[in-house]
């Protein structure tokens, strides 16, 4: 054995130095193994946590768990013996595992940052890139990349030797040979500094995007009265998800920065100035990176805390106190919020307006970074990609029939029945985690692509009967005529002529242009005001086309009305099972023939259609 390489050699330091190191290593091992095991256990117990963005969290927990369980016991035993006792082969395996799991954690954090970057700054691209299959492919590439760097010293590019107090092993960054210096430089660049630069760039762009979105809301002011609540909520959510991932990455970088600095000092030729303590302490700090993430989740991630409190009795104190539940259960995370969002004060009376708005809250993204699954309460829809909603500040104004239904007193609203008050329909699988939005300025839309959609909640069977254009049979007949290219159905008086009007895609001039009138079309015999053409919905054919093109992420119910939708089991809907037709829902005579189909909610319909046409 080459004694100069350090095997079996003791370092002349006081014994208590080894014992202090052993104590901290023991703490790191116990906390790292237990904490990351709880993270994995929580994700295995709660199916709703198993979303694609959360796969990165699971992968990070796995790598941290393996880091703690393979490094801490051996490090602890060697510290008690005050030397390396497992031989050269053991040193190589120990160092290989440390390099593999440490690099995996770093590159996994890079993947998390890129995921968050795409979600927040490029929503149209996110709809195509963020999926379970792609996430698994990215995770596989992360492990292969880490494996390549970890195998290099075993194959002759550098080597693994004891370090510090000779109780731990790593690659040889001290010996000044071309192979060792080349490996050290390349490893620091491609595993630490370049990923760190990319991570910093991603978070800078996310911060600027979120800040710009907030300023846009302030600038628009009252022009976005009906959508301000949704926009503010989604911006807060995206920022909270970003902060969760940012905290994880900052802690990890601080853990490995001292170690990277020590290796670069040795690479520069000043290794002789490094004492055994200056080599051992950074190594211990680096291995401690495996214990921080469980604490971050326990503090920030409410669903993680609730899951552990439910399945681990001794952790009951992690459960959140119950929240007050409003009529629409608006406090539930990752769900459609059906709430009273705007109160208009006037000299004569106060009006309440119901609008369907998308609500998300603290999670995954986890995400994720997504970090937040579907909620048990109410109809659910994950919406992480929502900053683009700022591109649509135009206030939605429905036809008079809908506006009349929106004006109620507060007492009447509290006593709303199924016929009068209905939650918005669920049209997406929650585990897909996207509500795509266009960037600003908006991209050019294809022909026959309306940018508005109706809020189906307020449409009664009587409203359907008053508007023949809404009749399902009439719509199919129009498809059989000269308008076979028409992919959409209108629930108001409007026609397809208004869909290409500038006010639909021009945010700045939307208010003024809405006062103009649109030209005549085959559906309307007279000029139609723009605000009467804001009620566009998917036809069954269009919906199924989107369903096929997007890989079946949508759930569309061709038959049955809103009453049928209400009778869906929340558990069945959350599992992503196909929605049944009206017969299997035991719908009775309260289902009018003229309402034999359900449609997407207002914002969901509009945004999904835009993203589909942009593909």
Curated annotation (Swiss-Prot):
Extracellular compartment spans: 1-19, 78-93, 158-189, 266-279
Biological processes per GO annotation: phototransduction; visual perception
Tissue distribution: Expressed in the inner nuclear layer of the retina, possibly in amacrine and ganglion cells. Expressed in a subpopulation of neurons in the dorsal habenula.
Cellular compartments per GO CC: plasma membrane
Stretches with biased composition (Basic residues): 469-478
Subcellular location: Cell membrane
Top-level taxon: Eukaryota
Transmembrane portions of the chain: 20-40, 57-77, 94-114, 137-157, 190-210, 245-265, 280-300
Main localization (coarse): membrane
Membrane topology of this protein: Multi-pass membrane protein
Single GO term (MF): G protein-coupled receptor activity
Cytoplasmic side: 41-56, 115-136, 211-244, 301-615
Family: Belongs to the G-protein coupled receptor 1 family. Opsin subfamily.
Protein name: Melanopsin-B
Organism: Gadus morhua
Gene, per the UniProt record: opn4b
């Amino acid at each position: 054995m080459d004694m100069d390489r350090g095997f079996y050699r003791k370092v002349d330091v006081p014994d208590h130095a080894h014992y202090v190191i052993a104590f901290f290593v023991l703490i790191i091992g116990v906390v790292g193994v237990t904490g990351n095991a709880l993270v994995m256990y929580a994700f295995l117990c709660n199916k709703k946590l198993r979303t694609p963005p959360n796969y990165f969290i699971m992968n990070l927990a796995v790598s941290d768990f393996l880091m703690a369980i393979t490094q801490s016991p051996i490090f602890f035993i060697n510290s008690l013996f005050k030397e390396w006792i497992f031989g050269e082969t053991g040193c190589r395996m120990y160092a290989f595992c440390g390099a593999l799991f440490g690099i995996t954690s770093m590159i996994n954090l890079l993947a998390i940052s890129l995921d968050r970057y795409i979600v927040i700054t490029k929503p149209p691209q996110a709809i195509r890139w963020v999926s379970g299959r792609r996430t698994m492919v990215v995770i596989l590439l992360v492990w292969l990349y880490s494996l390549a760097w970890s195998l290099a010293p075993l194959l002759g590019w550098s080597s693994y030797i004891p370090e510090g107090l000779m109780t731990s092993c790593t690659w040889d960054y001290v010996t000044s040979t071309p192979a060792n210096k080349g490996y050290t430089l390349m490893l620091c660049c491609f595993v630490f500094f370049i990923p760190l630069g990319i991570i910093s760039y991603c978070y800078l762009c996310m911060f600027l995007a979120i800040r710009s979105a907030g300023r846009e809301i302030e600038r628009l002011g009252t022009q976005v009265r009906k959508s301000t609540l949704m926009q503010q909520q989604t911006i807060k959510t995206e920022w909270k998800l970003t902060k969760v991932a940012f905290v994880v990455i900052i802690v990890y970088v601080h853990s490995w920065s001292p170690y990277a600095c020590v290796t670069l000092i040795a690479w520069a030729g000043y290794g002789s100035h490094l004492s055994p303590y200056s080599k051992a302490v950074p190594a211990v700090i680096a291995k401690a990176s495996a214990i921080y993430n469980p604490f971050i989740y326990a503090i920030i991630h409410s669903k993680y805390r609730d899951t552990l409190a439910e399945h681990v009795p001794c952790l009951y104190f992690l459960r959140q106190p119950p929240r007050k539940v409003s009529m629409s259960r608006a406090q539930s995370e990752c769900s459609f919020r059906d709430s009273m969002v705007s109160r208009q004060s006037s000299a004569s009376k106060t009006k309440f307006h119901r609008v369907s708005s998308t609500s998300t809250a603290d999670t995954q993204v986890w995400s994720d970074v997504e970090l937040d699954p579907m909620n048990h309460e109410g109809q659910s829809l994950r919406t992480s990609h929502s900053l683009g909603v700022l591109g649509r500040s135009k206030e939605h104004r429905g036809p008079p029939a809908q506006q009349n239904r929106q004006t109620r007193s507060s007492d009447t609203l509290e006593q709303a029945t199924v016929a009068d008050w209905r939650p918005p329909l669920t049209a997406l699988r929650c585990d897909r985690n996207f509500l795509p939005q266009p960037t600003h300025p908006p991209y050019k839309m294809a022909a026959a692509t309306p940018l508005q959609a109706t809020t189906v909640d307020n449409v009664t069977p009587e409203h359907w009967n008053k508007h023949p254009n809404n009749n399902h049979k009439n719509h199919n007949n129009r498809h059989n005529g000269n308008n076979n290219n028409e992919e959409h159905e209108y629930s108001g008086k409007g026609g397809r002529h208004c869909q290409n009007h500038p006010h639909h895609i021009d945010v700045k001039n939307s208010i003024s242009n809405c006062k103009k009138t649109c030209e005549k079309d085959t559906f309307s015999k007279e000029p139609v005001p723009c605000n009467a053409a804001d009620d566009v919905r998917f036809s069954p054919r269009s919906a199924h086309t989107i369903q096929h093109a997007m890989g079946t992420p949508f759930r569309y119910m061709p038959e049955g009305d809103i009453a049928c939708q209400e009778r869906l089991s929340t558990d069945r809907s959350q599992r992503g099972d196909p929605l049944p037709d009206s017969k299997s829902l035991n719908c009775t005579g309260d289902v009018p023939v003229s309402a034999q189909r359900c449609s997407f909610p207002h914002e969901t319909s509009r945004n999904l259609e835009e993203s589909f046409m942009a593909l």
